[in-house]
Each structure stands twice: as structure tokens, then as C-alpha cells.
């Protein structure tokens, strides 16, 4: 070993003439460890897109407003005393301090109406006529599109590797998929030709099982997008065959090697989310790469089935096992920030909302539906200026009283 090191030192000694003939070849060898990879990095930092974050700031207010909706409508005569708000809001886990629920309702006079009870002479709260109309329009829109909801649920169950999905997981994501409250009857039991409810073998959970897979429903939303791109923009068929619509957020750094990696990934073949891959050998590196791209296609299709092209990351995780999705979903989605966007606005950063980027343009859904439009009417009421609302004298005194208490504290 000593002899080897001595000879190596003599060879690399710059004072010796022999080094001039060997050093160039050494430089060529040293280039390899520092060469850039042409694969998409596994770990990437999240780049904020303020358009989606601002959208979620409004959604955060709407989420609390909807909870108060349900609270008020559950009371007799659909009214509630202001004095009971603190206790009931604490039970709902809304995170309000003392007197904050009443102050919150005052911010949205187009949704909540505070008035003095004519007999008891105490303040009560009820929904405004505009808010009640919005609830009625959304309810009617959900009922009118039950045939579409049946199709969405069929496609969702068809994506499962077992042909069944837990009923409770669908119930939790009912609002995102535009299903009515009684979907177990109106969507599942009312269509026995498509679904059947079965009990779990080891648990008491119920499962939604598909009766028969329909090949006509196995066409993904991204395939229709590719056809439009091919026909309208004249893009080469080979370039668009396995590609996704990629639109990176502002400020996302795209280097030369990253661009090459995306170019290679766009042309990588993959299995359809509706294809049964249980009999395939997935041990090779190429099969693993195809499986990862299939996971992107599964999440893309899952978001395409939602009414607003968005869903929380936590609810995607419910379908992880039945759709063969990766364990670390957040890190996986951050690899594809040109396709998806994860917003952490809402619930103090604990809630992660995943958007399908191609589904939105300038803060609005590209292809709006009746349910989405009905829900946006509530957003308009929330964002409407309080100055345009008619506020009676008793309400003004109540608001001034809250301000005085804040000053004392």
C-alpha cells in the first residue's frame, strides 16, 4: 500500500513532467460525479402560488360559515340565541374564544341576520333570505346532477384494485364528489345494476362494490385533453401520447437538466388507472417508473372526478391502498408541481388542499358546473361589503359593546 501511494504521489506531483500527460485524462474522469441527472428530483421545495392560496383564504371563511349554517338550521325555527353561540361553537371545535362567534357573524351580514326577539328581548341569529336561497340552489343542483354523480362514483370504484371502496371513505369526501346526503340510497341502492353494498369480512365496515366494469367509462379525463391538444394545436402524436398538461407556478426554477427530465418523463408510457396491474411483474426499474407515472394519472383522474377539481390531501390518503398510491403523498405531489398544487391555507396549516392546475384559470374553474356555481354564490355573499347590508340600531349597539370589551381587555 505504501508503495502504491508513493507512486501515485509521484505521478500527480505537478513538478514532474509526467503529470502533464496524465492530468488531462484525470480531468475527464472527474467530470462524471458532478454531472447533472436527467431525472425529476424526488424531493422538491414547494413554490407558492398566491392565486390558489388567496382562493383558499376565502374557502377558509366559507368553511366556518357552512358550519354555522348547519348549526343554525339544526335549531328549532332555524334560529339561535347569540348567548348560546360560545358554548355551541366550542362543541363544534371552531377554535373561537369568548364573544368571537358573535363577532364573526357580524362580519357577514349578507349571510347571517342578527335581530332582537320581540318577546324575550334578547338577540337571536338566523340566515338571511339570500343565504337560504343559496342553500336551496345548491341542494337543487346536487339533485339535478345525480346521473352524473352515479357516473363519477362508478369511475371511482373502477379505479380500485379490488373493485370495491369503503363506504365511509366516500361519505367523508361526499361534498367533493357532489354526492347528496342520502347518496347511500339515492346513488347506490337505487342503482343495483351498477353498485352493491357488502359487509367487510373482518370488520363491520361496508364497501361499495362495482357490479361490472364498463369499458366506455375507462377513458381518463387526460385522454380527452390530449385529443383536443392534438386536433386544435397540431402537436405531434408521439409527443402528446403519454403527456400531461404542465404549468409550473410563478417563480419555479426550471433548469436545463430539469427541462430534459420533464421531457423524458412526458414520453414515458404508463398503465391506465382503470387497468388491472395485479398480474404484472413490477420489480424492474422501468416498471417502477411506469407505476409512479400511473400514480400521477390516478390522482389526476381522482381530481377530475371532483366537482371543484380539488380535494384535501388527507382524503386522497383514504384511497391510497386501493389505488396503489405512494406512502409519502405530499413529497410525491411536490415532484409534479406543474400538474398539482398543494395549498396549506386553512386550519392553521394543518389542512392540505390539492388543486388540479389545469382545471383553473385566473381563479375560476375552466369548466364550471351547476354545483360549483351554486357554491360560488355563497363566496360572493361572504365577500360582499358589510356596508351594503341593512343593519338595525340594536345590532350596532351589540357591535359597539364587543368593541368596548376588546378595549378593556
UniProtKB/Swiss-Prot annotation:
Where in the numbering of this chain does the PORR domain appear? 47-386
Identify the Pfam families for this entry.
PORR
What the record says about disrupting the gene is: Embryo lethal when homozygous.
Q: In which tissues is it expressed?
A: Expressed in roots, hypocotyls, cotyledons and shoot apex.
Q: Name one GO molecular function term.
A: RNA binding
Ranges annotated as spanning the membrane: none
Q: Name one GO biological process term.
A: lateral root morphogenesis
Top-level taxonomic group: Eukaryota
PANTHER family membership: PROTEIN ROOT PRIMORDIUM DEFECTIVE 1 (PTHR31476:SF9), PROTEIN WHAT'S THIS FACTOR 1 HOMOLOG, CHLOROPLASTIC (PTHR31476)
Describe the task this protein carries out: Involved in pre-arranging the maintenance of the active cell proliferation during root primordium development. Does not seem to be involved in cell cycle progression.
Q: What is this protein called?
A: Protein ROOT PRIMORDIUM DEFECTIVE 1
What gene is this protein a product of? RPD1
Amino acid at each position: 500500500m505504501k508503495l502504491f501511494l508513493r507512486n501515485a504521489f509521484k505521478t500527480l506531483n505537478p513538478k514532474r513532467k509526467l503529470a502533464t500527460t496524465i492530468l488531462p485524462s484525470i480531468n475527464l474522469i472527474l467530470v462524471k460525479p458532478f454531472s447533472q441527472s436527467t431525472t425529476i428530483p424526488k424531493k422538491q421545495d414547494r413554490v407558492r402560488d398566491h392565486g390558489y392560496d388567496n382562493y383558499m383564504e376565502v374557502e377558509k371563511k366559507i368553511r366556518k360559515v357552512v358550519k354555522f349554517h348547519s348549526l343554525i338550521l339544526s335549531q328549532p325555527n332555524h334560529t339561535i340565541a347569540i348567548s348560546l353561540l360560545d358554548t355551541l361553537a366550542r362543541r363544534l371545535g371552531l377554535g373561537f374564544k369568548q364573544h368571537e362567534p358573535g363577532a364573526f357573524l357580524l362580519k357577514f351580514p349578507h349571510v347571517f341576520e342578527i335581530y332582537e326577539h320581540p318577546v324575550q328581548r334578547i338577540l337571536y341569529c338566523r340566515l338571511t333570505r339570500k343565504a337560504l336561497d343559496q342553500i336551496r340552489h345548491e341542494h337543487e343542483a346536487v339533485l339535478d346532477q345525480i346521473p352524473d354523480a352515479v357516473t363519477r362514483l362508478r369511475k371511482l370504484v373502477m379505479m380500485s384494485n379490488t373493485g370495491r371502496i369503503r363506504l365511509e371513505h366516500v361519505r367523508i369526501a361526499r361534498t367533493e364528489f357532489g354526492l347528496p346526503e342520502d347518496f347511500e340510497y339515492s346513488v347506490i341502492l337505487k342503482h343495483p345494476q351498477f353498485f352493491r353494498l357488502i359487509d367487510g369480512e373482518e370488520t363491520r365496515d361496508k364497501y361499495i362494490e362495482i357490479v361490472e366494469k364498463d369499458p366506455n367509462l375507462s377513458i381518463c379525463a387526460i385522454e380527452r385533453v390530449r385529443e383536443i391538444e392534438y386536433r386544435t394545436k397540431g402537436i405531434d402524436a408521439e409527443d402528446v401520447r403519454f403527456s400531461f398538461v404542465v404549468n409550473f407556478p410563478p417563480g419555479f426554477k426550471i433548469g436545463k437538466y430539469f427541462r430534459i427530465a420533464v421531457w423524458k418523463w412526458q414520453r414515458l408510457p404508463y398503465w391506465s388507472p382503470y387497468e388491472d396491474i395485479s398480474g404484472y411483474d413490477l420489480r424492474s426499474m422501468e416498471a417502477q417508473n411506469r407505476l409512479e407515472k400511473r400514480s400521477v394519472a390516478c390522482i389526476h383522474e381522482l381530481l377530475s372526478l371532483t366537482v371543484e377539481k380539488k380535494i384535501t390531501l388527507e382524503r386522497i390518503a383514504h384511497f391510497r391502498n386501493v389505488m396503489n398510491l405512494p406512502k409519502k403523498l405530499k413529497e410525491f405531489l411536490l415532484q409534479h408541481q406543474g400538474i398539482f398544487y398543494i395549498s396549506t391555507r386553512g386550519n392553521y396549516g394543518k389542512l392540505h388542499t390539492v388543486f388540479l392546475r389545469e382545471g383553473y384559470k385566473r381563479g375560476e374553474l375552466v369548466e364550471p358546473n351547476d354545483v360549483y356555481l351554486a357554491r360560488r354564490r355563497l363566496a360572493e355573499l361572504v365577500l360582499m361589503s358589510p356596508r351594503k347590508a341593512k343593519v338595525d340600531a340594536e345590532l350596532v349597539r351589540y357591535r359597539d359593546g364587543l368593541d368596548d370589551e376588546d378595549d378593556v381587555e
